[in-house]
Amino acid sequence: MSRILLDTHLLLWAVAEPRKMPPGVRSRIDAAEVFVSAASIWEVSIKAALGKLAADPAELLAEIEPAGFNLLPVTGEHAAAVARLPAIHADPFDRMLVAQAKTEPLLLLSNDSLLAGYGDCVELIARKPRRT
């Protein structure tokens, strides 16, 4: 069974906006052991407080277990691993997710093309095309 770490966008799509999930990704998630980082909940909390995201972090947290996902805490080992990453991406939340993926090891699914520079621990997922 594959082990997957969802980035924040894919987490939001999976639990709040499944219609945005690209074809085939949902079945991969259903067949895998899936992790959600506590850093993603933190990111949603900050962006919601700044008015940049209309999501309730407490509700998102409550949806993790019913969705069949595992909450991955941020450890000291994860934090130290961030320092070993090349400076490909400046976003601290994304850097933490990459560090967790490399440390655990997990495959990080993301729609952020900058993360591809971190190598085979990241797989890019394109958003489902809009119907016109």
List the predicted regions and their residue ranges.
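Short, well-structured N-terminal submotif of metal-dependent ribonuclease cores
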Residues: 1-36, 49-62, 66, 104, ...
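A generic structural signal for short hydrophobic patches within well-formed alpha-helices
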Residues: 11, 41, 79, 115-116
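Generic beta-structure capping elements
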Residues: 15, 39, 74-77
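Aromatic- and histidine-enriched alpha-helix N-cap/loop-to-helix transition segments
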Residues: 36-39, 96
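Phosphate/NTP-binding elements of NTP-utilizing enzymes
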Residues: 44
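Active-site neighborhoods of divalent-metal-dependent phosphate/nucleic-acid chemistry enzymes
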Residues: 57-61, 65-114, 125-127
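Active-site regions of enzymes building and remodeling cell-envelope glycoconjugates
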Residues: 119-129
